[in-house]
Amino acid sequence: DEATSALDPNTTAQILSLLRRINRELGITIVLVTHEMEVVKGIAQRAILLKGGRVSNSGDIVSLFLHPDENMKEFLGEEEVLPASGVNIRLFFPPAVAFDSVITHMARALEINFNIVWGKLERLDKNVVGSLVINVEPAHVARVEEFIKNAGVIYEIVSEDEIKSCAAI
């Protein structure tokens, strides 16, 4: 329980390395309780998110990050400041396409301009996944959706409620 919470980053890395080795060499399942998302990202293959003493999310770590629900987004503490005009599209890049040039290919293929609002790549255990928010003109949304579906990218249109809550920040 909270095995790494009071440790410096180097000691935390050493502890996580030891736990990985124990898991790999001895085949022992390790249950790690932590509030540190970097620890979860660095070692977990599966995770459970508790909220109010109840399981609110569970599954393999990559799926939890590629399909985050409101509880997961809240836990991650990622506030998105989003433009109020245009259409904001949140993209999730699975490991198979995390390093592909999907966005530049899309801009060239569709011959459109759009804004990249924010983005990042994250290492989750042995996988790398990406997330990105783009803002496009309403007239281009259907073409963008078709392109990103065909590219193997998971996406969601950001709701008006999310924009209003972020615009008030």
Residue locations for each model-derived region?
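Conserved H-loop
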Residues: 27-33
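Helix N-cap at the start of a conserved alpha-helix in ABC-type nucleotide-binding domains
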Residues: 9-11
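A short, surface-exposed alpha-helical micro-motif characterized by mixed small hydrophobic
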Residues: 40-42
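C-terminal boundary and immediately downstream tail of ABC-type ATPase nucleotide-binding domains
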Residues: 65-92, 108-110
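ABC ATPase "signature
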Residues: 58-59
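Helical segment within the ABC ATPase nucleotide-binding domain
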Residues: 13-26
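Walker B catalytic motif
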Residues: 2-3
